[in-house]
Design a protein with these regions (language model features):
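Class I S-adenosyl-L-methionine-dependent methyltransferase catalytic core
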Residues: 1-255
Length: 255
């Protein structure tokens, strides 16, 4: 008998199959946390429930303040989160509150993922840097830039787009090697505009990961319009520009 893909009911399966997810917002507590680009625990929980099972082992190589690991804890999963920032690792450890089988490593994912002692994983859920966009002032709502770190190994500090993609490919090749067969790597990304240049990060990254061996299985559109309450008419009145209020979840499958 074939193994079930997840523990969802038929009703939950149908609801989660809709290509646009709108019911995922940060809590008031999450909004107060000092991180420039975090995502809600609710998103991670929904992804784990949809693409794995309650006994899974979860990997996040860009762990930040630990939303993925908190979701793993809440669903009685085990997990490993890795992040360069000592400050954010401390916050992540506070959030998981000593949960058994959940580990947070303050270090370089390129190095940690090469260590065979970390074992294998059933699923990866993560959100890599959106290139160096955090270092730029946002034109849509006027928010100032927030530097994630000054680490030379921080991919968010790379200025060349093609090199940035190449480095992401290298990192996710290490992730690929740590995933069990028939598992998913779910990647939260957003497309980028720098003045007149548009960079379709979601598709560029997906095709890089296909070169590794991942199957680009599908994608989810995460509607975040309710999170944006101070938008400006971009380009008005000379050149019409799109205010992006959505992000993507790339569904990459390791056969």
């Amino acid at each position: 008998m074939a193994k079930k893909a997840n523990d969802l009911t038929g009703k939950e399966w149908l609801q989660n199959s809709f290509s646009i997810w709108r019911d995922l917002k940060k809590t008031a507590e999450e909004k107060k946390m000092n991180h420039p680009a975090s995502y809600p625990v609710a998103l991670c929980e929904k992804l784990i429930k949809t693409f794995s099972r309650s006994d899974c082992r979860v990997l996040d190589p860009f762990n930040g303040i630990g939303s993925t690991m908190v979701a793993a804890k809440n669903l009685n999963c085990s997990g490993l989160g890795i992040d360069l920032s000592t400050e954010f690792c401390e916050i992540a450890n506070e959030r998981i509150d000593g949960a058994p089988n959940i580990s947070v490593i303050n270090g370089d994912s390129f190095k940690v993922l090469k260590d065979s002692n970390i074992g294998e994983f059933d699923i990866c859920i993560t959100s890599p840097p959106y290139w160096d966009i955090l270092n730029m002032k946002r034109s849509a709502d006027g928010k100032v830039s927030v530097n994630y770190s000054d680490e030379g190994s921080d991919l968010g500090n790379l200025s060349d787009y093609e090199y940035f993609l190449t480095q992401l490919k290298e990192l996710f090749s290490l992730v690929y090697n740590r995933l069990k067969p028939d598992s998913y790597c779910l990647i939260n990304v957003m497309d980028i505009r720098k003045k007149s240049e548009f960079y379709p990060l979601h598709s560029d990254l997906a095709y890089k990961l296909r070169e590794i061996g991942f199957v680009f299985d599908d994608l989810i559109i995460w509607d975040r319009q309710s999170d944006y309450n101070n938008m400006r008419p971009l380009g008005y009145p000379y050149r019409f520009r799109i205010n992006k209020v959505h992000e993507y979840i790339l569904i990459m499958h390791k056969k």
